[in-house]
């Protein structure tokens, strides 16, 4: 019998070999095509604010308005709010609304329409989503991935980063935005640590 393992996130190949064939890991063949390792371009903007500031939305809009992008958020409410704010900027600029929401509470047909729009090579689109598009669903080739606030795990971060840079020679590009209220002046030390930033 043959066993095949595929992963975009495994870093310890020897451990993966032992997992695939515990008795004979030396018989596991690793196929890693030349050029498969993409360079990574990463940027992070941190805002001290009680809620998502307009500057974040403006920067996100400027970065994504002409690119195929997945914009990950950590809640459905955040997806809906950011989608509405980005589409308001499209209307302000007399552009077609190109930001589509995608999360588990949205009707299946609406989610599938967003996925189909992302696969359309002739129309610019960005999907603002929760973890629903973190893996598994083919949405075509992306120009970049954006993340609003920290992911809940390192694995989620790696999966989301891995959605971009799938063209030969293309870098993986991720823009991360974090927002955190400033600490009160008399707050204890541990409350002054910007955990969302970290």
Q: Which residues does each PLM region occupy?
A:
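Conserved helicase motor "Helicase C" RecA-like lobe of SF1/SF2 P-loop NTPases
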Residues: 77-98
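Conserved interdomain linker/interface between the two RecA-like ATPase lobes of SF2 helicase motors
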Residues: 2-80, 179-183, 195
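Conserved catalytic network of the ASCE P-loop NTPase/AAA+ motor domain
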Residues: 1, 22-25, 35-38, 61-65, ...
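Alpha-helical scaffold elements adjacent to nucleotide-binding pockets in ATP/GTP-utilizing enzyme cores
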Residues: 15-20, 81-86, 113-117, 138-144, ...
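Short, ordered loop/turn segments at secondary-structure junctions
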Residues: 8, 33-35, 104, 132, ...
């Amino acid at each position: 019998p043959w066993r095949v393992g595929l992963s975009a996130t495994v870093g310890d190949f020897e451990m993966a070999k032992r997992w695939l064939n515990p008795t004979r890991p030396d018989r596991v063949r690793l196929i890693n095509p030349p050029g498969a390792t993409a360079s990574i371009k990463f940027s992070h903007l941190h805002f001290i604010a009680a809620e998502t500031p307009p500057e974040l939305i403006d920067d996100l809009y400027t970065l994504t308005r002409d690119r195929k992008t997945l914009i990950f958020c950590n809640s459905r409410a955040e997806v809906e709010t950011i989608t509405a704010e980005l589409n308001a900027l499209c209307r302000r600029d007399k552009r077609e609304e190109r930001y589509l929401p995608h999360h588990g509470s949205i009707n299946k047909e609406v989610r599938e329409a967003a996925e189909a729009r992302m696969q359309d090579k002739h129309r610019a689109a960005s999907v603002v989503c929760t973890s629903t598009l973190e893996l598994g669903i083919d949405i075509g080739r992306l120009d970049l991935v954006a993340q609003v606030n920290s992911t809940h795990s390192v694995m989620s971060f790696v999966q989301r980063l891995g959605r971009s840079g799938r063209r030969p020679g293309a870098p993986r590009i991720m823009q991360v935005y974090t927002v955190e209220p400033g600490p009160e002046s008399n707050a204890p030390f541990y409350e002054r640590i910007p955990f969302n930033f970290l």
